[in-house]
Amino acid sequence: MGKLLRKPLNERIAPGVTLVQDINQGNSPLSYVGFRLIELEEDAVYQETLDGLECCIVALTGKISVSEGDHVFSEIGTRANVFEKIPTDSVFISGGRAFQVKADAEKARVALCYSPADRNLPTTLIKASDNSIEQRGKYQNKRLVHNILPDVSEVASSLLVVEVYTDGGNFSSYPPHKHDHDNLPAESLLEESYYHEINPKQGFIFQRVYTDDRALDETMAVEHQNAVIVPEGYHPVGVPDGYDSYYLNVMAGPKRVWEFHNDPDHEWILERD
């Protein structure tokens, strides 16, 4: 199966460009989802040509400019810190195209979310105001959700991207749910990656990834800027008191539909008043 928990790489890959996370088909069990996290110093430029993949470029922190062909989106990004808990700007780019990302401020943190390009689609700016915002859950199961590329969006062909905030003492991706069988309308098959940040950053959260038969059952202490791969199974997150959790989810599979199946042992939690 390979390691599900990925620590930061912190590799300098170009002048002023640091690769923090890199998840792809070659170094993981994933077939549909890819993820990169880069940090850019002021005026640094990251360049890439997409080969069979589409990409959502998320301006996590700082101001960036994204260019692809005749498209130039300047000074996008809304936050100095993800824990400002406001939506941010993103850019979607379809497969077979070359793009570059430039830092317009002292430092920028950028997420690159990948999945197979099933169709040729227009390059699109996804403004912060385009994100739908949800408050989900109750009791100790509350979280704030920013939907960047939900399944109702027609911007992408296979990619799903969402941000989730969970306050200390709460659980998210909970009750435990999974989406690893192509059994629509009951359940869709979607791989997933989690990129985590924690406030204050010396904290940690817990994430368990497990299947019904426990052939896969891994519980991880996840630290700031770690990533977790979910090729299959349930994948709940628990946040200790005193710390807040942020994660960016990337999902993709054979059909661009998010339908999940709750662990029946814990579904009773949803039935409480």
From Swiss-Prot:
The gene is iolB. Its EC number is 5.3.1.30. Belongs to the isomerase IolB family. It comes from Listeria monocytogenes serovar 1/2a (strain ATCC BAA-679 / EGD-e). PANTHER family: 5-DEOXY-GLUCURONATE ISOMERASE. Gene3D superfamilies: Jelly Rolls. Involved in the isomerization of 5-deoxy-glucuronate (5DG) to 5-dehydro-2-deoxy-D-gluconate (DKG or 2-deoxy-5-keto-D-gluconate). The keyword Membrane does not apply. It catalyses: 5-deoxy-D-glucuronate = 5-dehydro-2-deoxy-D-gluconate. GO terms for biological process: inositol catabolic process. One of its GO terms (molecular function) is glucuronate isomerase activity. This is 5-deoxy-glucuronate isomerase. Pathway: Polyol metabolism; myo-inositol degradation into acetyl-CoA; acetyl-CoA from myo-inositol: step 4/7. The keyword Cell cycle does not apply. InterPro entries: Deoxy-glucuronate_isom_IolB, IolB_Bacilli, KduI/IolB_isomerase, RmlC-like_jellyroll, RmlC_Cupin_sf. Keywords: Isomerase. Pfam families: KduI.
